[in-house]
């Protein structure tokens, strides 16, 4: 009992069904099988604090979880549940964008932080809004916890800005358009995960056509006030149902946070005065002055492999190939011979970190976020 078989792929349905019945049809449940119970996770009046260390734990990090009730499985097959998922996705996406932006600041105590809202650890009967932070230095762990919770409180107290919400909706609708235009090229793993969610927790699995039409109507109609109201529900005003988990790299001579320090960091975050977030939107072109265009020196077609090779006046070689694998997708990559091997030994570390630094540095006058 309580087992399922999911088959996804280009298979002979009748033959596959017959084989499943042949292989599994004779399995019987034991006479006195143990009942399957979903153990309830109790509410807690006082915070739970867990501190641990291990030599194989490479980084020090801290996480605070605010437990709350799950969405009932019996009510998931509804438009209301899809709306709930949209509000949650919008709030978490915009909050995580703020964490990414904050981490770029020199005085930010964490190198990275994020928020999620899902199962409380592995429990099916309790969910949790979780905030995670990894400090720049182990000595800043408590400060990282404070800063990460303060950022969430900023969203709770002042909400998100219209410009943030406009960007989120534009990105979501763009993703929907792309998924819909490539609906006949979905991967088997996508279908499998939808079936698995439906079997385990009654997650709805509407068709891509239904989802597309519903979201195209829903997204423009939901005001930012609805998202902000959802955000307000995530952090409780008291200390009930709070869990703090801190994992540390075990190292000789290291000093680890105490229960009192972590609780004090959380209380500081809950009591600290916060100001509204300012979305510094830049309405200017990425390139203010267009470069002088070059010329195409030569063009050569390869009919056998279906590509065209161009030689440009700046010495670059461009290879163009048209495919119909995915609609509305253009993939571009560039490389130059030599790379870091052209630099001396003293620039080894600089060359090694170059790609990561550039990826986190934004473009032109625009920051990463």
Describe each PLM feature range.
Residues 182, 237, 268-272:
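Surface-exposed polar/charged interaction patches
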Residues 45-51, 114-118, 227-228:
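Glycine-rich, charged/polar anion/phosphate-binding loops
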Residues 1-8, 58-79, 99-224, 240-248, ...:
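M16 family metallopeptidases and their MPP-like homologs
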Residues 1-107, 145-146, 247-369:
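His/Glu-rich zincin catalytic helix
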């Amino acid at each position: 009992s309580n087992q399922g078989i999911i088959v996804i792929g280009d298979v002979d349905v009748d033959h596959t069904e017959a084989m499943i019945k042949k292989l599994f049809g004779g399995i019987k449940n034991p006479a006195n099988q143990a009942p399957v119970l979903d153990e309830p996770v109790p509410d807690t009046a006082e915070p739970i604090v867990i501190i641990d260390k291990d030599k194989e734990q490479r980084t020090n990090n801290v996480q605070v979880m605010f437990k709350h009730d799950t969405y009932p499985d019996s009510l998931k097959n509804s438009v209301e549940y899809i709306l709930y998922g949209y509000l949650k996705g919008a709030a978490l996406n915009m909050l995580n964008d703020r964490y990414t932006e904050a981490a770029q600041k020199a005085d930010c105590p964490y190198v990275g932080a994020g928020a999620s809202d899902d199962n409380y650890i592995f429990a099916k009967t309790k969910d949790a809004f979780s905030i995670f932070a990894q400090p720049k230095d182990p000595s800043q762990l408590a400060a990282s916890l404070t800063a990460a919770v303060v950022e969430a409180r900023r969203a709770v107290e002042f909400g998100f800005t219209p410009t943030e919400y406009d960007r989120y909706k534009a990105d979501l609708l763009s993703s929907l358009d792309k998924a819909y235009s490539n609906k006949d090229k979905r991967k088997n793993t996508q279908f499998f995960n939808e079936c698995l969610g439906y079997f385990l927790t009654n997650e709805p699995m509407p068709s891509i056509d239904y989802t597309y039409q519903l979201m195209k109507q829903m997204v423009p109609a939901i005001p930012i006030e609805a998202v902000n109201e959802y955000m307000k529900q995530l952090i409780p005003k008291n200390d009930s149902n709070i869990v703090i988990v801190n994992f540390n790299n075990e190292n000789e001579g290291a000093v680890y946070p105490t229960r009192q320090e972590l609780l004090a960091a959380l209380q500081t975050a809950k009591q600290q005065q916060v100001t509204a977030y300012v979305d510094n939107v830049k309405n200017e072109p990425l390139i203010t002055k267009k470069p002088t265009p070059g010329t195409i020196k030569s063009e050569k077609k390869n009919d056998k492999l279906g590509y065209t090779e161009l030689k440009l006046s700046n010495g670059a070689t461009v290879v163009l190939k048209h495919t119909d694998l995915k609609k509305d997708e253009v993939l571009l990559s560039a490389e130059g011979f030599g790379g870091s091997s052209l630099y001396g030994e003293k620039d080894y570390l600089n060359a090694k970190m170059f790609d990561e630094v550039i990826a986190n540095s934004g473009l032109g006058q625009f920051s990463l976020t």
